[in-house]
Amino acid sequence: MTLFQVYTRALRYLTVHKWRVAVVVIANVILAAITIAEPVLFGRIIDAISSGTNVTPILILWAGFGVFNTVAYVAVAREADRLAHGRRATLLTEAFGRIISMPLSWHHLRGTSNALHTLLRASETLFGLWLEFMRTHLATFVALVLLIPTAMAMDLRLSFVLIGLGIVYWFIGKWVMGRTKDGQASVEEHYHSVFAHVSDSISNVSVLHSYNRIEAETKALKSFTEKLLSAQYPVLDWWAFASALNRTASTVSMMIILVIGTVLVKNGELRVGDVIAFIGFANLLIGRLDQMRQFVTQIFEARAKLEDFFVLEDAVKEREEPGDARELSNVSGTVEFRNINFGFANTKQGVHDVSFTAKAGETVAIVGPTGAGKTTLINLLQRVYDPDSGQILIDGTDISTVTKNSLRNSIATVFQDAGLLNRSIRENIRLGRETATDAEVVEAAAAAAATDFIDSRINGYLTQVGERGNRLSGGERQRIAIARAILKNAPILVLDEATSALDVETEARVKAAVDALRKNRTTFIIAHRLSTVRDADLVLFLDQGRIIEKGTFDELTQRGGRFTSLLRTSGLLTEDEGQQPRPKAIAS
């Protein structure tokens, strides 16, 4: 993107407050135009002093002019600050909502730390651009447009010096931008690397402590920051050199104006006040040119940050639901997978030609070796991923034609990793249904056999669970997740190895709750417990993304196929296939 394209797209975010922004910008433009009168007034004061005429009226006018400028500037700056801060807050909220609504496949590909860093850096960059646009950008441009004609009206010869100075500034800026474009992009990449390393290390701090990696990770971060600085310093050097060149050009221009002005005054072609006024114009022009240089530098530095953010925003908008997506309602729970194919990029993993039907209220157990595609199948049902071909239907409705909100309202999921937020136990359970009363939360916790450990805490349901639930044991986290699903009361239930973190005693207590929860609900279980597989109406055995065997538990054990071999390998089935297997876990 060009600098102009980056700038105009950044300003489009202000259109939601277009009238307020317009008032602020127009006020700043008027102030910039009025400011041009200041050198003229000062020149008239010098002329009055040198000629011995009454200077008081002009002094009063100048003082009043200064007071008005100050008060007006404060009022305009205050409104600009409020607008910029407010828009930044709403942008963060809006962008966060769009990003977090993206499917997990997008987050896995993009990376959580990358998306977070891009959002935070972009919001700060946009804030700076908006603030400077309302305060100085347009006002600077207007002042430059008005300064030159006004100066030319006073004296054409001195005006050419100012025009030459402006051209020099432009060439220096263009030259330095060409020299630093790649370097600035490299700087932004290094910032992403630093942020990703910090985020990755902090989120896995327990592993780092366990393997005594603190010093090593700190050294690694130092290496990342050194690479960042090695990329940053050349860019800073070029802009420092540009600043020195601009300052030299400004000083030389002032000297030329003074020399020419002195000659013209001696020849009687100009008054001293005119020269003083022109020096004021030169100072104004230099100040505005410096602002313009800073503005261009700001846009230049912003481009690398904002281009990535705009790509992120475009990707999010491309994934937005079509306007004609309908609501999935009155779900009974019949689920059909019809010739489903899906593959992950650059791998052979996925699912291939999967077809089966789960009638309303049935329980489907999905078993198979690691990497067989069990979780992928469930993720397709929840539209974490969309299939490459085929259809998934709920009550005969293709789920690709319904809103994701209505689809997910129809499905309650208990993940292998409970996935708790750093909030209270009550808030985590209430994620299942935001409108649930405290009594309903307690009832759901009781059904999940969670009340004992909750009541044992000093703060009970107000206990903070910590980041990702790290203040609770694995079994405690899982029971909260089960309570959450119970509270949601959805017609379709997904249990992704939901009791894997529970001990035998706790599992026995939870099983009754899960069995009650499964009644009159279509349930999909990534199975790891024998009792769960035995109770299923349909068992799917997956291997390398394909359904190898399908049927009831008894049918598959009598068939003597891959499912039977898995049971025997796990020690769950003897050579006598009719013998009752021992209650152990199935490898998955």
UniProtKB/Swiss-Prot annotation:
GO molecular function list: ABC-type beta-glucan transporter activity; ABC-type oligopeptide transporter activity; ATP binding; ATP hydrolysis activity
Gene Ontology cellular-component terms listed: plasma membrane
Stretches assigned to the ABC transporter domain: 335-569
Compartments where located: Cell inner membrane
Lineage: superkingdom: Bacteria
Chief location bin: membrane
Catalytic activity: [(1->2)-beta-D-glucosyl](n)(in) + ATP + H2O = [(1->2)-beta-D-glucosyl](n)(out) + ADP + phosphate + H(+)
CDD domains: ABC_6TM_NdvA_beta-glucan_exporter_like, ABCC_Glucan_exporter_like
Alphabetical list of InterPro entries matching this protein: AAA+_ATPase, ABC1_TM_dom, ABC1_TM_sf, ABC_transporter-like_ATP-bd, ABC_transporter-like_CS, NdvA, P-loop_NTPase, Type_1_exporter
Coiled-coil region list: none
Family according to the record: Belongs to the ABC transporter superfamily. Beta-(1-->2)glucan exporter (TC 3.A.1.108.1) family.
Domain notes: In NdvA the ATP-binding domain (NBD) and the transmembrane domain (TMD) are fused.
Protein name: Beta-(1-->2)glucan export ATP-binding/permease protein NdvA
Native source species: Agrobacterium fabrum (strain C58 / ATCC 33970) (Agrobacterium tumefaciens (strain C58))
Name of the gene encoding the protein in the UniProt record: ndvA
